[in-house]
Design a protein with these regions (language model features):
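Short, low-complexity N-terminal tether/leader segments at secretion or assembly junctions of large
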Residues: 1-31
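Collagenous Gly-X-Y triple-helix signature in extracellular proteins
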Residues: 30-240
Length: 240
């Protein structure tokens, strides 16, 4: 059986003859192509680089501002402790919405939790998916968004709050003072805030239950969800 040669001695000095980083990167790309890549903990992978910053989120923010994504792949993650619960925030897409929206988006990484938070929340407390007189956007007046803004955001460590950016999106409108509607009728730009849930189109790459056109907005499917259910299916709690 042939053995693998990794070093050779020349002039009395042992030298590497293979590029470990390139080999590992090629392996990751191969796993991504086959939709089996489960991601790496970026805090571990880039520990020496992160040590030059106050924390891992200051580091990733600096990387994003410089548009330096070398060695960072869709599926990689940064752990966050929220209300004593560990949540692995995965890279869902890199510059997915760069230079889009009515207020052009700069360089960014969108993170989505690998699994669900154990605390559950009902999207709406009534069987009604409409906006109201204060806002025609169903999501913006939903019980879910209220919980994200007023409860879950409070669980974030300050080091995350200091770096997190808001997401802007073209959202569907569904409201009439005459009564409840079953389909959306228009759209408009909205600030989703620091925490949000992906749109149907961002997960499935198509509108299945929403209103064609209005529900899609300017959404694109995040790479992490493309052509596989590996990241679409999430457990209750870390590793659930």
């Amino acid at each position: 059986m042939a053995s693998e040669i990794s070093r050779i001695e020349t002039g009395g000095v042992s030298r590497p003859i293979k590029d470990e980083i390139a080999r590992n990167d090629n392996l990751i790309l191969h796993q991504q192509d086959n939709r089996i890549y489960k991601g790496r903990n970026l805090v571990t992978v880039f520990a020496s680089e992160i040590a030059k910053y106050s924390d891992e989120w200051a580091w990733i923010r600096a990387r994003i501002k410089a548009a330096n994504y070398e060695g960072i792949y869709v599926g990689d993650y940064i752990p966050v402790t929220m209300n004593k619960e560990v949540v692995n925030m995965q890279v869902a897409g890199i510059d997915t919405y760069y230079n889009t929206t009515d207020q052009p988006v700069g360089h960014h990484i969108d993170f989505i939790s690998k699994d669900c938070f154990t605390e559950t929340i009902q999207w709406n407390t009534t069987n009604n998916n409409n906006g109201d007189s204060t806002s025609p956007y169903p999501y913006m007046v939903s019980n879910l968004k209220k919980w994200l803004d007023e409860t879950l955001y409070g669980y974030l460590p300050d080091k995350v709050k200091n770096q997190i950016a808001h997401k802007r999106m073209l959202l569907e409108q569904r409201y009439s003072s005459a009564g409840a509607l079953t389909d959306s009728t228009s759209w408009g730009w909205q600030d989703l805030g620091a925490l949000w849930v992906p749109l149907e189109y961002e997960v499935f790459g198509a509108i299945v239950w929403g209103t064609p056109g209005w529900s899609e907005g300017q959404a694109v499917q995040y790479p992490i969800f493309a052509n596989t259910y590996l990241s679409r299916i999430k457990g209750a709690g870390n590793g659930g």
